[in-house]
Each structure stands twice: as C-alpha cells, then as structure tokens.
C-alpha cells in the first residue's frame, strides 16, 4: 500500500489550500457576474424559452 515517506510541510499544505480557494473565488465571482447579468437583462449569451400564448390562435 502506498504511504507517504515524509510529513508534508505546513507551507506546502497552505499553498495547496490557497490555490484551491483561489479557484473557488474565481468560480464564485463568475457565477455572481452571470447572475447579475441575467437579472439586469444585459445577458446576451442566454436563450430564454418564450411562453406560447393561446390568444394568437383565436384571431
């Protein structure tokens, strides 16, 4: 069974955690930006399904 030979230093551990948290921060910022764009109506890259109205068939 594979076992690490030496203990990982706190500095190396903190580097990995910082990188992981930075990636999470970027993803959260992008998600917030996309949400704001959708709510403000300035989003161009989204396709919204248009509800079909029954009133058009009666004319």
UniProtKB/Swiss-Prot annotation:
Checking SUPFAM superfamilies in the record gives: Zn-binding ribosomal proteins (SSF57829)
Q: Keywords in UniProt for this one?
A: Ribonucleoprotein, Ribosomal protein
State the GO CC annotations: large ribosomal subunit
> What are the BP-aspect GO terms?
translation
**GO MF term (any one):** structural constituent of ribosome
PANTHER family named in the record: 50S RIBOSOMAL PROTEIN L32, CHLOROPLASTIC, LARGE RIBOSOMAL SUBUNIT PROTEIN BL32C
Belongs to which family?
Belongs to the bacterial ribosomal protein bL32 family.
- What is this protein identified as? Large ribosomal subunit protein bL32
